[in-house]
Amino acid sequence: MNSASVPQGMDLANRRAWQTADAVHRFRQEGWTDPGEAAAVSLVAPEARGAPILDIGVGAGRTVPLLTAISQDYTAVDYTPALVALCRQRHPTRRILHMDARDLSAFADAAFGLVVFSYNGIDAVGYDDRMTVLREVNRVLRPGGLFVVSTHNRTGPGFGERPLSWFRFTPNPLRMGWRVLNAVRSLPDVVHYLHNRRLHYDGPGYSVRTAAAHHFGIVIVYATMQEQERELAETGFQCEAVFSNDDGRRLAEGEDLSGTWWFHFVARKTASPAAGA
């Protein structure tokens, strides 16, 4: 499959995965995903207090109580109907809309003071669509507004995961029996991986790969820290901080990132990107 076909294939695979019962169950979790997310939101909270917030990729509503603690002027969107319905059921008094982050035309320019796109949701679309999302976020943010976004690390431990990578022969018949049984149980993972492998693609500073989540049912973008900073700069943002998911530490250029599964970026709108940029 050529690179031009990757975004459509990603969309089909990921939309299918988000609507499974397993995905809906997983999205019911509560609280912070990791220390890095907590650190990133804590950094922007004082400045965003009381400002209108847009929560992109809200899923089943995990982030609703976390962000409404900062401001009651809150709007959430997600592009998966089943998750929007569940989120509305769990948070009936909140404004939850069915919307794709690539098209936020329902919102006026400069409508929000803070936009959050959590749980690596931006990774679920191809590179060109990713840039479209960033331009749309820039448009709906006020001048000087803040953006929190997470993305998978191409140099981290999650990049290049494969089903059955744990399988090893052992002369112990009991252990080998359990391993074979678990391998049989993992057959759906293998089928998904082999089906999605045709979508794998490498670009400058980023790659598209099948991820282990949802039984290897999703295909996502993995980016280097420098690439994500470049994308933000190109779409009118200045990166103010980057946090590691594993321990919440603030990352610096040049340090070892091999233990970081994904990044949490805090960026500020400094300009509007040129048309078509």
Question: Where are the model-predicted features located?
Answer:
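A short acidic, Gly/Pro-enriched loop at the edge of an enzyme's catalytic core
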Residues: 102-115
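Class I SAM-dependent methyltransferase SAM/SAH-binding core
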Residues: 60-103
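A short glycine-rich, Lys/Arg-flanked "PGG" loop and its adjoining helix->strand segment in the class I
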Residues: 131-143
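Conserved class I S-adenosyl-L-methionine
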Residues: 1-59, 66, 260
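SAM-dependent methyltransferase
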Residues: 150, 154-231
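Core SAM-dependent methyltransferase catalytic element
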Residues: 252-277
